[in-house]
Amino acid sequence: MDKIYVGTIVSTHGIKGEIRIISKLEQSLKEKVFKVDNSILINDKEYKLKSYRRHKNYDMVLLDDFNNINDVLFLMKQKVYIDSKYIELSAKEDFELNYKEYEVITSDKQKGVVKALEETGNNYKIIRVVVNNKEELVPYNEHFLKKIDSSKKQVEIELL
């Protein structure tokens, strides 16, 4: 089973057992993950989603068979995952989740590795790559990120 990290349960909300999850996933991916009747994994146990909504920066989730705040208190501060069989990832989404597994190929055919994918604010991201033992920062946009091949786990980039 291949698990994808979704976020962390930070607190409860209300008395009906709703839990707050803080997650760094893109909204398009959250829409795939938090579908009603999907199952999420907490401590390697599956829980079925009864409802989902956004509230401020949180993902608010009700789980089946939990109708009271006291029933969900044991889940506090736990990490939430989803089995990858429940969602179909695009190449871009796969890269954002599994960037450390990707090999970098530059436009002049040099090879390297992705060290990090960092947010710099205002929804802007930078890819930190290492090519020939030299660290480079590459803007995460279509001008520099030429091709993502999720089957080969390769990303083709343009360096300046």
Walk through the language-model features, giving the residues of each.
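Short Lys/Arg-rich amphipathic alpha-helical segments
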Residues: 1-160
